[in-house]
Amino acid sequence: MTHKERPLDVVILAAGQGTRMKSALPKVLHPVAGRPMVAWAVKAAKALGARDIVVVTGHGAEQVEAALAGSGVRFARQAQQLGTGNAFLVGAEALRHQGDADILVLYGDTPLLRPETLRALLADHRAHNSALTILTAELPDATGYGRILRDADGHVERIVEEKAATPEEKAVREFNSGVYVLDARAPELARRITNDNPAGEYYLTDLLELYRQEGAQVRAFKLHDPDEVMGANDRVQLAQAAAVLRRRINTAHMQAGVTLQDPSTIQIEDTVTLGRDVTLEPGVILRGQTRVADGVTIGAYSVVTDSVLEEGVIVKPHSVLEGAHVGKGSDVGPFARLRPGTVLEESVHIGNFVETKNARLAEGVKAGHLAYLGDVTIGAETNVGAGTIIANFDGVHKHQSTVGAGVFIGSNATLIAPRVIGDAAFIAAGSAVHADVPEGALAIARGKQRTLEGWSRRYWSGMHEGVRKKLPWLAGWLERQ
């Protein structure tokens, strides 16, 4: 097997505690653009066609492993935090195959690495028959990073850590990203790393000297964008990483035919899919498994999570959709809320301050204002008046109601579930409907109006004079009576 034909295995180091995050959540599980940081590393490894991916866990191992369950990776636990060299060895020894693959080392807190960068790194490693290839970058000020020191011929000589560097070495701009491609000998050499240092830890960087002692080829592959190897060790760096990913994601969507009216304010998670000629107004947030079809407009400051929006849908500003399916040509909002289980068929109108949950509205249904529609199926072309409430909860259980097609529900009506309203029925405004309504019937369920002539004059005349003086309009009105 030639060097170029070797399979690729990946070890992802994700065992650190991340104390600078000051969080109960393991560092690598902090989300960036819709994925935990470690999931970005897994995604990149999969894009390379890796044969085997092992994630090394330690702090919060159960949480990390649960978060990645079903992703196709395997896990190895680092029992004690003994440094990167020990963590790598734990992961390498857990690989299914030994001694026949190149091994890529990634970190669970570097979510910005592009698969194309890693492909180029791997290609360089194999083209030069290298034993160890280090991914490096340059910064005007590389404070905090280990520096790459080269000999007079430009070959990598050693890596010096920040705390051990001389002033001259600290001036070096090229730094070690911590990402490596190693040949199949790496696990064997890693067993020879010692912890003879002030921290008493095993450092993966010591592999460089061990390879050099073997006379092996060691290279550095320098990338042009140092942002790619930006680690997120605290909340500030997490926000910086999120901003980089947001720009990447937004740019990709714009290049694919999506209009973002103010990209700096729009957040689209990596798991979202958008069609062509979609328009996103300022402040829009799209999350989870949201799928948006061609020609959809989403208004300013709307939040859409795990929802499907079919062709031509209009979501007006300040609307919140979660777990909803909105059919072609429907419009929602402004200030509407569609909760999980909502299905709007074609050309449905949901207006301002309407809330739905576990509701299916057939084609042409209109609910224009101030309504709650929960646990209900509503037939085609039904009109839901302002203030309509489906009273679906009895204090213990939710109950389902059915409203037929072509029904007219007057304003401020309450349907006390479970109810069945037949096709073409009328519900009078202000009714509290507590019995089923047959097809084509009119239901009126409200108290009879009483009108008491002269009541206001008697009421105010009996009021204390001090109260009447606070109402200047009242004296004039009483004089006219």
UniProtKB/Swiss-Prot annotation:
Pathway(s) the chain acts in: Nucleotide-sugar biosynthesis; UDP-N-acetyl-alpha-D-glucosamine biosynthesis; N-acetyl-alpha-D-glucosamine 1-phosphate from alpha-D-glucosamine 6-phosphate (route II): step 2/2; Nucleotide-sugar biosynthesis; UDP-N-acetyl-alpha-D-glucosamine biosynthesis; UDP-N-acetyl-alpha-D-glucosamine from N-acetyl-alpha-D-glucosamine 1-phosphate: step 1/1; Bacterial outer membrane biogenesis; LPS lipid A biosynthesis
EC number: 2.7.7.23, 2.3.1.157
Active site: H369 (proton acceptor)
Co-factor: note: Binds 1 Mg(2+) ion per subunit.
Cofactor annotation: Mg(2+)
Repeat recorded as keyword: yes
InterPro entries xref list: Bifunctional_GlmU, GlmU-like, GlmU_C_LbH, MobA-like_NTP_Trfase, Nucleotide-diphossugar_trans, Trimer_LpxA-like_sf
Assembly and oligomerization: Homotrimer.
Protein family: In the N-terminal section; belongs to the N-acetylglucosamine-1-phosphate uridyltransferase family. In the C-terminal section; belongs to the transferase hexapeptide repeat family.
Protein name listed in UniProt: Bifunctional protein GlmU
